[in-house]
């Protein structure tokens, strides 16, 4: 994914 928390 583009954002990994």
UniProtKB/Swiss-Prot annotation:
Q: Which domain of life is it from?
A: Eukaryota
What name is this protein filed under? Unknown protein 8
- Source species of the chain: Ginkgo biloba
